């Protein structure tokens, strides 16, 4: 499986405030980014997989909403996370 508990724990410990921090915006954005990257690779091989395409679009929307929230709440945290993950503004 592409996203097991150990990989999630690694993402949360790297981007969250602690190992068990699963709710902070940064941790959720990092997890969504990992899933988006994986689904993008899947879509390159399976162009007609429309259910995955929809799931990918929904994940991008969720990540965008969290980024907008973080930008309004704390601009420095927003800038740090987009620089760390290599996202466009």
Curated annotation (Swiss-Prot):
Please indicate which superkingdom the organism of origin belongs to. Bacteria
Which biological processes are named by the entry's GO terms?
translation
Q: Which SUPFAM superfamilies match?
A: S15/NS1 RNA-binding domain
Q: Which UniProt keywords apply?
A: Ribonucleoprotein, Ribosomal protein, RNA-binding, rRNA-binding
GO CC annotations, alphabetized: cytosolic small ribosomal subunit
Question: Could you tell me one molecular function GO term of this UniProt entry?
Answer: rRNA binding
Q: Does the keyword Ribonucleoprotein apply?
A: yes
Database matches in InterPro entries = Ribosomal_uS15, Ribosomal_uS15_bac-type, uS15_NS1_RNA-bd_sf
Q: Give the family, as the similarity comment puts it.
A: Belongs to the universal ribosomal protein uS15 family.
Query: What HAMAP family does the database record attribute to this sequence?
Result: Ribosomal_uS15_B
Tell me the function of this protein: One of the primary rRNA binding proteins, it binds directly to 16S rRNA where it helps nucleate assembly of the platform of the 30S subunit by binding and bridging several RNA helices of the 16S rRNA.
Q: Can you state the subunit structure given in the record?
A: Part of the 30S ribosomal subunit. Forms a bridge to the 50S subunit in the 70S ribosome, contacting the 23S rRNA.
This chain belongs to the protein called: Small ribosomal subunit protein uS15
Q: Which organism is it from?
A: Bacteroides fragilis (strain ATCC 25285 / DSM 2151 / CCUG 4856 / JCM 11019 / LMG 10263 / NCTC 9343 / Onslow / VPI 2553 / EN-2)
Phylogenetic lineage: Bacteria, Pseudomonadati, Bacteroidota, Bacteroidia, Bacteroidales
């Amino acid at each position: 499986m592409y996203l097991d508990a150990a990989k999630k724990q690694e993402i949360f410990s790297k981007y969250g405030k602690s190992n068990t921090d699963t709710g902070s915006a940064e941790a959720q954005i990092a997890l969504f980014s990992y899933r988006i990257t994986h689904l993008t690779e899947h879509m390159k091989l399976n162009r007609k997989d429309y259910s995955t395409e929809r799931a990918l679009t929904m994940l991008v929307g969720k990540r965008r909403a969290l980024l907008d929230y973080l930008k309004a709440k704390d601009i420095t945290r927003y800038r740090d996370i987009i620089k760390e993950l290599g996202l466009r503004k």
